Amino acid sequence: MRILGLSAALLILGGCASTNEPPVQANDPSFAPVVPDYPRETVVEDGSLFRSQLANNLYSDVTARRVGDIITVTLSENTQASKSADTSTAKDTNVNLNPITGLAGQAINIGGESIQLGVSSSRDFSGDAAANQSNSLIGAISVTVVDVLPNSNLVIRGEKWLTLNQGDEYIRLTGIIRPADISPENEIVSTKVANARIQYSGTGSFARAQEKGWLTKFFDSTWWPL
């Protein structure tokens, strides 16, 4: 009996085991701004304000195009999804065996009753499901260019943290953009970011209040038989 109780306890603990990723922390080195690695100048001209690595043509724009440049991403995400399914099946089966007859064509009786058999079965199934989901994210975040691909596309990455009185709110964004999609104001819409990874969440007591307890997680896990 003790072994059975111990096994049940282990199953409960296994079902309650959390598989969540470690909590997000601020100042993650992976999202730190990238400092461009400019080559050292062989000749240093004292008193000169001109820096060749930062020089722009008279007709060039100021949009991001190099590693370390900053670009503003306008968040405009709005997705809606719905799905429904309805399934219904039915099956009826009937098998009848007429009375068994003898050589003379007369029914064989046992105890005054003829031998005959009848079997019937009926099976019905019906099920329906519906799911609706919508998401909306509006805002802006400034990110930096971390890499320039051979085809001139830009890899961007950045984060924004807002410290509130009951925790922190953060936005993280990574993706690939085309220089042609950047506006003259050095902005781009998030819908034009390829391979975008946009994360908006929070930490602290307010975020923890929305998490399920360990017992609720057990009842929602696959270990719960019902």
Curated annotation (Swiss-Prot):
Query: Which GO MF term does the entry hold, naming one?
Result: cytoskeletal motor activity
Question: What subcellular compartments does it reside in?
Answer: Cell outer membrane; Bacterial flagellum basal body
List lipidated residues, S-diacylglycerol cysteine: C16
Signal peptide residues on this chain, from the entry's feature table = 1-15
| Topological type in the membrane | Lipid-anchor
| Lipid attachment in record (N-palmitoyl cysteine) | C16
The record's annotation in Pfam families points to: FlgH (PF02107)
**Superkingdom per UniProt:** Bacteria
Q: Which GO terms describe its biological process?
A: bacterial-type flagellum-dependent cell motility
Keywords assigned by UniProt, alphabetized: Bacterial flagellum, Cell outer membrane, Lipoprotein, Membrane, Palmitate, Signal
Where does this chain mainly localize?
membrane
Task: Tell me the InterPro entries matching this sequence.
Answer: Flag_Lring
The record's GO CC annotations read: bacterial-type flagellum basal body, distal rod, L ring; cell outer membrane
What is the documented function of this protein?
Assembles around the rod to form the L-ring and probably protects the motor/basal body from shearing forces during rotation.
Complex and partners: The basal body constitutes a major portion of the flagellar organelle and consists of four rings (L,P,S, and M) mounted on a central rod.
To which protein family does this belong? Answer: Belongs to the FlgH family.
This protein's name: Flagellar L-ring protein
Organism of derivation: Alteromonas mediterranea (strain DSM 17117 / CIP 110805 / LMG 28347 / Deep ecotype)
